[in-house]
Regions:
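Alpha-helical transmembrane segments of integral membrane proteins
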Residues: 15-23, 40, 44, 72-76, ...
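Juxtamembrane helix-loop-helix connectors linking adjacent transmembrane helices
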Residues: 62-127, 216
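Transmembrane helix-loop-helix hairpins at the membrane interface
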Residues: 116-217
Length: 217
């Protein structure tokens, strides 16, 4: 009887993936209603850490890369960063009021020139790894690459919502979706660390252009 009851609460790997994705989105949405700054808006990141570790994915196994994987990581990161960065540089001023967008970031996160640079470094380094660890390392194998990339894009839409017009935020999600597909393919071919390096380089491009456009640097 005890085994039967326990089995009722045991989810299949696919179900665990969807449950984790929904929980992550729920926490991301809740960040808009919690007045705890970075802590409240960053609760969904705990989901990114917990579920892969609970699934037995060991961090130390992810830090393996060969020369081929490094070359692919750097090439794909520069390629994607250059394309996405160019699109943002030329299109964002036409879809968003840059002054209002900057005021939105400052109001939500209380940025100064110093703190926004620190935040950008954390996003490029640590946040990009958490996203790769969760989406590519955990969710890809449980929900499939298209679903994983869709949730990845939707998470960015939820987090960015309210900072700019809805069309601008949705367009950002449309850019993020193919990036998620690409990093999944890099991970399948070369491993998770390669996907992370590619993601990190892309974020450096995008954050640098964003800081420039918004007048932080």
């Amino acid at each position: 009887v005890a085994d039967k009851l326990r089995n009722l609460f045991l989810l299949s790997p696919r179900s665990k993936g969807f449950f984790a994705a929904l929980l992550l989105l729920a926490f991301a949405v809740s960040g808009h209603f919690l007045e705890h700054g970075w802590l409240g808006r960053g609760l969904y990141k705990f989901v990114m850490i917990f579920f892969p570790l609970a699934a037995g994915i060991e961090l130390k196994r992810q830090f393996k890369i060969d020369r081929r994987g490094l070359i692919i990581a750097i090439a794909s990161g520069i390629f994607l960063g250059a394309i996405a960065g160019t699109l943002i540089y030329f299109l964002l001023p036409h879809f968003a009021n840059l002054s209002e967008l900057k005021n939105g970031f400052d109001s939500r996160y209380h940025y100064t020139t110093c703190t926004v640079i620190i935040a950008s470094l954390l996003i490029a380094g640590i946040n990009s790894f958490l996203e790769e660890f969760f989406y590519r390392g955990f969710l890809d194998d449980r929900a499939g690459i298209p679903v994983s990339a869709f949730i990845f894009a939707l998470q960015h839409v939820v987090v960015l919502w309210g900072l700019a017009g809805s069309l601008t935020v949705i367009l950002a999600g449309l850019i993020v979706f193919p990036a998620g597909i690409l990093w999944s393919l890099v991970r399948l071919r070369c491993g998770l660390i390669s996907a992370w390096i590619s993601h990190l380089l892309t974020d450096i491009f995008l954050l640098g252009i964003g800081l420039l456009l918004l007048g932080y640097i």
